């Protein structure tokens, strides 16, 4: 009887122990053009998603083209928060390249605010030693206060509103919550097929590396005539390996991101 009690007690301790939580090790690059050599462990939740932002630290994150995270990006009450004001800002990346994946997060933005979520991005240096913007190589899922930011009325058919593929495909239905409220985003990338979801509704889909993709680029601000470098990079989005970085945009406005997680697909 005593032996049975001991066995049950040990089993219960093991079942409830936080140490039993699943972990996933990802390799990240710590600097521009650096190899993904630094190993970092992240929690894997019950849905099989890797929580690439733990709500407490910025491990795995750095500024685009830098070896550090700019000080205007902070951890604030469980959120990754970009603050307006003085000091260095700029776009940021999670420094591991993903190929086939589901990316989920929630965001909210200030009144009249603008930001974006990038995927399959590359760090592209200019010959003069500066950096091209991340959106020269990465599709952008728009983050916007649709009611108060002028970009919502620009572009074509609402293709600059929240969760749109920026300047190419409008998110329909347009179901974004107002500024100051949380919106949920889900981006699915698998073998070139891409979906944007907003607040649990699929709002657009498209396929990379197809004649239709090239046509969309040619009809956008990223056309071969208007911006040859962007056209070349986006037309071969993800490079030869069809993989790239996840990033968030500093557009000068306060924005918060939380519950950032990724599921790697085969």
Segments predicted by a language model, with ranges:
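Carbohydrate-interacting regions of secretory-pathway proteins
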Residues: 21-266
